[in-house]
Curated annotation (Swiss-Prot):
Family, per entry: Belongs to the arsA ATPase family.
Residues at the catalytic site: D58
Subcellular location: Cytoplasm; Endoplasmic reticulum
Residues annotated for Zn(2+) binding in this entry: C275, C278
Primary role: ATPase required for the post-translational delivery of tail-anchored (TA) proteins to the endoplasmic reticulum. Recognizes and selectively binds the transmembrane domain of TA proteins in the cytosol. This complex then targets to the endoplasmic reticulum by membrane-bound receptors, where the tail-anchored protein is released for insertion. This process is regulated by ATP binding and hydrolysis. ATP binding drives the homodimer towards the closed dimer state, facilitating recognition of newly synthesized TA membrane proteins. ATP hydrolysis is required for insertion.
Signal peptide extent: none
Protein name: ATPase ASNA1 homolog
Entry keyword set: ATP-binding, Cytoplasm, Endoplasmic reticulum, Hydrolase, Metal-binding, Nucleotide-binding, Transport, Zinc
One Pfam family linked to the record: ArsA_ATPase
CDD domains registered for this protein in UniProt: ArsA
GO BP term, pick one: tail-anchored membrane protein insertion into ER membrane
EC identifiers of the protein: 3.6.-.-
Amino acid sequence: MVDNLEPLEPSLQNLVEQDSLKWIFVGGKGGVGKTTCSSSLAVQLSKVRESVLIISTDPAHNISDAFDQKFTKVPTKVNGFDNLFAMEIDPNAGLNELPEEYFEGENEALRVSKGVMQEMINALPGIDEAMSYAEVMKLVKGMNFSVVVFDTAPTGHTLRLIAFPQVVEKGLGKLLRLKMKVAPLLSQFVSMLGMADVNADTLSQKLDDMLRIITQVNEQFKNPEQTTFVCVCIAEFFSLYETERLVQELTKCGIDVHNIIVNQLLFLQNSHDSCSMCASRFKIQEKYLDQIADLYEDFHVTKLPLLEKEVRGPESIRSFSENLMKPYEPKGKPKE
């Protein structure tokens, strides 16, 4: 490392202070504490932003466990907060599992559109998961949250989430090119069902609206002023390898990433007084922390402790979230 380079602040203070951010993704390998970190970040953002939404896109839906509160597919206020909301979606469920609020309308047209749309998108490989993200994004954008934090599934799912606007743009483009063929068929279909008042262009208009929103989201995802990604890892080989792969893929996708959280670290006061396993783990972690420092010298690297108790419940998360803002100092650490 070059000695005269000033190291970047080892916290997420830079993200919390960046008022322009609209979308923050938190991801990494399974089991590294992504949910605790994303929930803690959302709590800190709620102190300085008007309204914050945290969305879980992991089918395991750990944010319900983290906040000790059941969340659904509709944004729900988190207990103990006035401006923090949470929701959980399953991207594998497809459009049929989304709540009816996503397909509002005064007549049967939109309900027909939902079914027809599901059938049509099933014919396009990879677009079903992307379209469920798209419908959620449409809902979220309409609610005008100041910032949205995504608690993502393990890496493979995360990369698909990041790429979904491009997948949807491509898929909807194909559908819209077919709309002249689809509209007459839809007209015949709804007439057979006795719904003569339904406008055959309803589906086409819905697709047009969706494409417009997704194009906008795609532009925002590629704008570092509006979107960034926080990688969470632990100081072990496989986690570090996965983090490097994730950083490279994000860079390839044009997504900003300049924050890494290293979680579950041992902060030993005196390795001689520690058990042999703790001392051994400490040495392993030190080795990988050195590698992280070399690999990511132009990143904000935040180090979080391994705690004796799990972080669960709003007050516990609120307390733990302070570690994102200033470097963790173990209790009883001797003054230098």
